[in-house]
Amino acid sequence: MATVNQLVRKPRVRKVAKSNVPALEACPQKRGVCTRVYTTTPKKPNSALRKVCRVRLTNGFEVTSYIGGEGHNLQEHSVILIRGGRVKDLPGVRYHTVRGALDCSGVKDRKQARSKYGVKNAKA
């Protein structure tokens, strides 16, 4: 335990919190343009072809964003919205594409968890 005199001379140093999503710059989402749309394979023990895209953001950052859901309509020069949230089995992918916003369509025939995939309610 430090004495009062020690604390007067040299105060305690606050720990600086490091952001997991630096490219968002404390914003909830950011807009960007797809520079490359491709598939990649996850780390062991998983196996799949995960859909991802390289995005040039409005603030100049270039990041990799995961495209969730079954099927998508993204291609090069598509304007998309990204949010934070990493993909655990894809190293370097720290952002998610927001489905149903800007040029990214919602997931076709989605019935459950629709709000996460940009799908409006189907009126019966």
UniProtKB/Swiss-Prot annotation:
Alphabetical list of InterPro entries matching this protein: NA-bd_OB-fold (IPR012340), Ribosomal_uS12 (IPR006032), Ribosomal_uS12_bac (IPR005679)
GO MF annotation list: rRNA binding; structural constituent of ribosome; tRNA binding
Superkingdom of origin organism: Bacteria
Keyword Ribosomal protein among record annotations: yes
Biological process (GO), any one: translation
Any Pfam family hit: Ribosom_S12_S23
Keywords attached to this entry: Methylation, Ribonucleoprotein, Ribosomal protein, RNA-binding, rRNA-binding, tRNA-binding
GO cellular component terms, semicolon-separated: small ribosomal subunit
3-methylthioaspartic acid modified-residue sites: D89
Gene3D superfamilies: Nucleic acid-binding proteins (2.40.50.140)
UniProt family annotation: Belongs to the universal ribosomal protein uS12 family.
Subunit structure and binding partners: Part of the 30S ribosomal subunit. Contacts proteins S8 and S17. May interact with IF1 in the 30S initiation complex.
Known function: With S4 and S5 plays an important role in translational accuracy.
Xref: HAMAP family: Ribosomal_uS12_B
Name of this protein: Small ribosomal subunit protein uS12
Species annotation: Erwinia amylovora
Source lineage: Bacteria, Pseudomonadati, Pseudomonadota, Gammaproteobacteria, Enterobacterales
Underlying gene: rpsL
